[in-house]
Swiss-Prot record:
Residues 252-456 are annotated as: N-acetyltransferase. This is Bifunctional protein GlmU. In the N-terminal section; belongs to the N-acetylglucosamine-1-phosphate uridyltransferase family. Acetyl-CoA binds at residues 386-387, 423, 440. The gene is glmU. The active site is at residue 363. Residues 1-230 are annotated as: Pyrophosphorylase. Residues 231-251 are annotated as: Linker. It catalyses: alpha-D-glucosamine 1-phosphate + acetyl-CoA = N-acetyl-alpha-D-glucosamine 1-phosphate + CoA + H(+); N-acetyl-alpha-D-glucosamine 1-phosphate + UTP + H(+) = UDP-N-acetyl-alpha-D-glucosamine + diphosphate. The lineage of its organism: Bacteria, Bacillati, Bacillota, Bacilli, Bacillales. It comes from Bacillus subtilis (strain 168).
Length: 456
């Protein structure tokens, strides 16, 4: 197989987005458009991927990291000029180069693979990805000869009345023989109304050289959607959401209301898991089998076990074990590890805490910067007092400890194995194992106090 290369065009500012955020960084289902494109391209067994950056170059590089190499297009002088920036990386390479726009987040690796196969089978020097549009207004038209061969691409504004009736459009994705691409690109002129160097002009150059130019027509126009404004962004979001949700349902996940369920493209969900409406799953999330999520739950960059239930709650950058019950209205904050068979109940906040197997915090508690052992019970209103205004301190609650209601554990402090803390205590010193800590004022009852008040 020939070596494969990819050039992703991501230099445009995207003025029609009317945004401070550069166009290709606008998210679709939680992931920037350009990252969707790059991630799909990387499935093609590439030898090298080059992203052409311009506006927002540093932000794009930061987002993509080492997934790509980069070339800067300092002035946006057209698509051919953009591809030419990759010349130092690719001009001396033998193989095929696929050129993709960074604002086409719905394009799949499967479609690009089919285009590459068509390119190879036809022994073409250039292959165009085309699609049939119900309304082709604004798109370049694919003009074919009587025998079906591609003759040229005509931009909408330059098309004749007859040519505008053509519904097969240029999607802006191409495959080239690498040597032919960089030989022809040096011949592209900017003699046009915009004064720019257009990549479609390479077709006529190659045809004039007697080279084969092919086209692969995808049956899915949605895939080729280019995002240039917020309307198209909304359409891409909807199409991507439908694709992601359909994949999970086909893999055995139940979505009670797919239209109101938002799942990251990077989420992995086990079979027989049920997701209720209003659930938002962001980033790299793993969810086991037979789990119930939602309604109205947000999970971000976390791992959730099997047979776990999370209702009306937030889990962020944390790990939750098997057979856990969370919520309603619980908040698992970053760097928390929740063990197996745990209960985290109403209005409980957990932050940066190891929470052991079979332990419980059922109501109205804050547990931060803590190590909670196994079989621990935190009564209603238990608080780890972890912050002195400057530093955070560790609270350790060892296996089998029982913390009574409305207790404050002032860190740094340790409650030993099997120890009890009496309700209403403020604990400032370590509690030995098996001991009972009582840290509250002794109750005093004053007889007839209220009666005497009312006499005054």
């Amino acid at each position: 197989m020939d070596k494969r290369f990819a050039v992703v065009l991501a230099a445009g500012q995207g003025t029609r987005m009317k945004s401070k955020l550069y166009k290709v960084l606008h998210p679709v289902c939680g992931k920037p458009m350009v990252e969707h494109v790059v991630d799909e391209a990387l499935k093609l067994s590439l030898s090298k991927l080059v992203t052409i950056v311009g506006h927002g170059a540093e932000e794009v590089k930061k987002q993509l990291g080492d997934k790509s190499e980069y070339r800067v297009q300092a002035k946006q002088l057209g698509t051919a000029h953009a591809v030419k920036q990759a010349q130092p990386f690719l001009a001396d390479e033998k193989g095929v180069t696929i050129v993709i726009c960074g604002d086409t987040p719905l394009l799949t690796a499967e479609t690009m693979e089919q285009m590459l196969k068509e390119h190879t089978q036809r022994e073409a020097k250039r292959t165009i990805l085309t699609a049939v549009a119900e309304d082709p207004t604004g798109y370049g038209r694919i003009i074919r000869s009587e025998n079906g061969a591609v003759q040229k691409i005509v931009e909408h504004k330059d098309a004749s009345e007859e040519e505008r009736l053509v519904t097969e459009i240029n999607t802006g994705t191409y495959c080239f023989d690498n040597e032919a691409l960089f030989r022809a690109i040096d011949q592209v002129s900017n003699d046009n109304a915009q004064g720019e160097y257009y990549l479609p002009d390479v077709i006529e150059i190659l045809k004039n050289e007697g080279e084969t130019v092919a086209a692969y027509q995808t049956g899915n126009f949605q895939e080729t959607l280019g995002v240039n404004d917020r309307v198209a962004l909304s359409q891409a979001e909807q199409f991507m959401k439908e694709r992601i949700n359909k994949r999970h349902m086909q893999n055995g996940v139940t979505l009670i209301d797919p239209m109101n369920t938002y799942i990251s493209p990077d989420a992995v969900i086990g079979s027989d898991t049920v997701i209720y409406p209003g659930t938002v799953i962001k980033g790299e999330v793993q969810i086991g089998e037979d789990t119930i999520i939602g309604p109205h739950t947000e999970i971000m960059n976390s791992a959730i076990g099997s047979r776990t239930v999370i209702k009306q709650s937030v889990v962020n950058h944390s790990k939750v074990g098997n057979d856990v019950n969370i919520g309603p209205f619980a908040h698992i904050r970053p760097d928390s590890v929740i063990g197996n068979e745990v209960k985290i109940g109403n209005f409980v906040e957990i932050k940066k805490t190891q929470f052991g197997d079979r332990s419980k915090a059922s109501h109205l508690s804050y547990v931060g910067d803590a190590e909670v052992g196994t079989d621990v019970n935190l009564g209603c209103g238990s608080i780890t007092v972890n912050y002195d205004g400057k530093n955070k301190y560790l609270t350790k609650i060892e296996d089998g400890a029982f913390i009574g209601c409305n207790s404050n554990l002032v860190a740094p402090v340790t409650v030993g194995e099997g120890a009890y803390v009496a309700a209403g205590s403020t604990v400032t010193e370590d509690v030995p194992g098996k001991a009972l800590a009582i840290a509250r004022a002794r109750q005093v009852n004053k007889d007839d106090y209220v009666k005497n008040i009312h006499k005054k």
